[in-house]
Amino acid sequence: MPEKMSLRLVPHLACIIFILEIQFRIADSNDPCPHNQGIDEDIAESILGDWPANVDLTSVKRSHKCYVTCILQYYNIVTTSGEIFLDKYYDTGVIDELAVAPKINRCRYEFRMETDYCSRIFAIFNCLRQEILTKS
């Protein structure tokens, strides 16, 4: 009897292993910096601080989009699931939540159909930066 039961479990176990393998592959593909040992903060601040106006998103290489996304993750602004967390900046008064939150929501909505994680995060951040640059 135990042999029959264990034989019936084999297809179920194979299915579970297959699903887990797919989950891990998806999780790995969403991490723009899986081998990153840290960020050079001077370079990161330079990239984020000297943002050019009117960036053509199609001309930016995916590797740069992923690097910017990695920087945003390093500073805990973005999660690997794409959530944007600015609470610490709101709480300290660095960013005015009432002014910025609607812009973030508009930018997030504008690029909601982008399926590539790095491209979506980069586009949202670029959109927000353009909003800020045009108002400055």
Swiss-Prot record:
Disulfide bonds join 33-70, 66-118, 107-127. One of its GO terms (molecular function) is odorant binding. The lineage of its organism: Eukaryota, Metazoa, Ecdysozoa, Arthropoda, Hexapoda. It comes from Drosophila melanogaster (Fruit fly). Belongs to the PBP/GOBP family. Pfam families: PBP_GOBP. Changing residue 87 to N: In strain: Canton-S, KY02010G20, KY02073G20 and KY02013G20. Keywords: Disulfide bond, Olfaction, Sensory transduction, Signal, Transport. Present in the aqueous fluid surrounding olfactory sensory dendrites and are thought to aid in the capture and transport of hydrophobic odorants into and through this fluid. Residues 1-29 form the signal peptide. One of its GO terms (cellular component) is extracellular region. Changing residue 58 to I: In strain: Canton-S, KY02010G20, KY02013G20 and KY02073G20. InterPro entries: PBP/GOBP (IPR006170), PBP_GOBP_sf (IPR036728). SUPFAM superfamilies: Insect pheromone/odorant-binding proteins (SSF47565). Changing residue 99 to T: In strain: KY02106G9. One of its GO terms (biological process) is sensory perception of chemical stimulus. This is General odorant-binding protein 57d.
